[in-house]
Each structure stands twice: as C-alpha cells, then as structure tokens.
Amino acid sequence: MLVAGDVYRPAAIDQLHVLGEQIGVEVWSDKENKNPVDIAKKAIAEAKQKGFNTVIIDTAGRLAVDQQMMNEIEAIKNAVSPNEILFVVDSMTGQDAVNTAKAFNDKLDFNGVVLTKLDGDTRGGAALSIRSVVDKPIKV
C-alpha cells in the first residue's frame, strides 16, 4: 500500500493515486486531513486491517533542512515505528544532497539511500559522497 503523506504539494496526492493505478498498487489518502503524522497512523491501521505487509509512506520532499519539517518526519517515525526508512534523493541535486542526507540521518538514522533520475547526465558524485558521509547503502 502507498500512503499519500505529502500534504504540502497541491498535486502530490493525486499524483500518487495515478502512479498507484498505473502499477496496480492501492493508495491510501485522506484529503481532508492536513496532519502527516495522523495520516501515517491511520494508514498503518488501515493497512493492518486489510492485511498489507508492506506500506510505503510518501512524505513531503525536503530540499533543504527545515527544522519544522525535520521534527514532523521524526514524529512520523516515532508514531509508526517503521522497519525501514529510505532517504530518496534526486541524483541531479548534486553536493547539496550530502548535507541534507547527513541531517536526515542524524535525525532518523535511515537504512539506505535511493537515487532517482539516474538516467540523466549526472556522474554520481553525490551518491558516493552521501554513501561515505552517512555510511548507509545505496539501495537499488
């Protein structure tokens, strides 16, 4: 089950529903609720009730380290006790991603890194730097 937890980007929920439909995965959302922590807790309860064994919570993207949003993502972690936390980064972000990855890892102790847009012309320097700084695997 995919969970639409990005309440900040206007089209995020609809976009996740389209993706879920395209790949045949159920998407849970609550368009009336603007509290990502509450959304995550309700979605986990729904997933358990329906017998899902995998839940992916899509949260708001954070291009820079914003303390309020960092606290929010930590609250989601504490509320749902995930088995795995992945730091997803646009491979075209460059070296700025290293500082963001370090801040996220310090706050969340994530399990690995997922790089998007690798089909572009980036050379992967940020990936190697992130791997070195946070000492977490790059997931494929």
Annotated model-derived regions:
Residues M1-V140:
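P-loop/Walker A NTP-binding module and the surrounding RecA-like catalytic core of P-loop NTPases
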